[in-house]
Swiss-Prot record:
A motif ('Ionic lock' involved in activated form stabilization) lies at residues 116-118. Its main location: membrane. The modification N6-(retinylidene)lysine is found at residue 288. GO terms for molecular function: G protein-coupled receptor activity; photoreceptor activity. Gene3D superfamilies: Rhodopsin 7-helix transmembrane proteins. Belongs to the G-protein coupled receptor 1 family. Opsin subfamily. This is Rhodopsin. It comes from Cambarus hubrichti.
């Protein structure tokens, strides 16, 4: 109780119907996420032709999503059943740390996947191909930097506290001291605004490159007096473009998933009167959905 901010005491308990609904949602998404990401990891690791440097990033994305749901799913089921957090203050902090860690790792893995698509499509043969060593270094940097950021609240830079709905835990966005808020400013930049800027930059040039390629193909076809010009190289480029579209779709879905979390943090800092315990649930709903559809998009592609 000592970890719960006074802001939440002004609200009555949530409607009891919210808990079984949330439990059913978590059961559904938990099973789909764990099964989908496990299959993705198993297929990529046991199919030799798929063990490429680029696909190491896809496997890492599946691993981060799998770990997120593996660590979030059981505690959420327990808290929804009891209508409150019953796992103690220490596990509350561990729960929040693991959720932030896997989310941050997922975000930056998506960024590196996008950058790899940019390197393949925009730079083409002029770009340096992704090697297994480079992909491994990218993955290592993702986990090291994510751990560094997410472990900071254990040392007093912000704190991990129960959410207002008492079914989960996260960063403290209600404390007004500059130390706590500075963490949220920098962390929001690191896990949201910077990845968004990099992603937009990459896809602007990807779209330009695809448009220029298609225009060149049409112009060449006109000169040769034929309807279309599609050789083997063009088909390969077209396949790469389809992969880029799949990646773009996944990134867009990811930002839809994580924007509610950002808004909850910033509303909590600057307009807390608008933030009720029910609203904080939406951050869970959208974030957990992201871990479900990532393996679907990448497994198909």
């Amino acid at each position: 109780l000592h970890m719960i901010h006074l802001h939440w005491y002004q609200y009555p308990p949530m409607n009891p119907m919210m808990y079984p609904l949330l439990l059913i949602f978590m059961l559904f998404t938990g099973i789909l996420c764990l099964a989908g990401n496990f299959v993705t990891i198993w297929v990529f690791m046991n199919t030799k032709s798929l063990r490429t440097p680029a696909n190491l990033l896809v496997v890492n994305l599946a691993m981060s999503d799998f770990l997120m749901m593996f660590t979030m799913f059981p505690p959420m089921m327990v808290t929804c059943y009891y209508h409150t957090w019953t796992l103690g203050p220490t596990f509350c902090q561990v729960y929040a740390f693991l959720g932030n860690l896997c989310g941050c790792a997922s975000i930056w893995t998506m960024v590196f996947i996008t950058f790899d698509r940019y390197n393949v499509i925009v730079k083409g043969v002029a770009g340096e191909p992704l090697s297994t060593k480079k992909a491994s270094l990218w993955i290592l940097s993702v986990w090291v930097l994510s751990t560094a950021w997410c472990i900071a609240p254990f040392f007093g830079w912000n704190h991990y506290v129960p959410e207002g709905n008492l079914t989960g835990c996260g960063t403290d966005y209600l404390s007004e001291d500059i130390l706590s808020r500075s963490y949220l400013y920098i962390y929001s930049t690191w896990v949201y605004f910077l990845p968004l800027a990099i992603t937009i930059y990459c896809y602007v040039f990807i779209i330009k490159a695809v448009a220029a390629h298609e225009k060149g193909m049409r112009d060449q076809a006109k000169k040769m007096g034929i309807k279309s010009l599609r050789n083997e190289e063009a088909q390969k480029t077209s396949a790469e473009c389809r992969l880029a579209k799949n990646a773009m779709t996944t990134v867009a879905l990811w930002f839809i998933a994580w924007t509610p979390c950002l808004l909850i943090n910033w509303v909590g800092m600057f307009a807390r009167s608008y933030l009720s315990p029910v609203y904080t649930i939406w951050g869970y709903v959208f974030a957990k959905a992201n871990a479900v559809y990532n393996p679907i998009v990448y497994a198909i592609s």
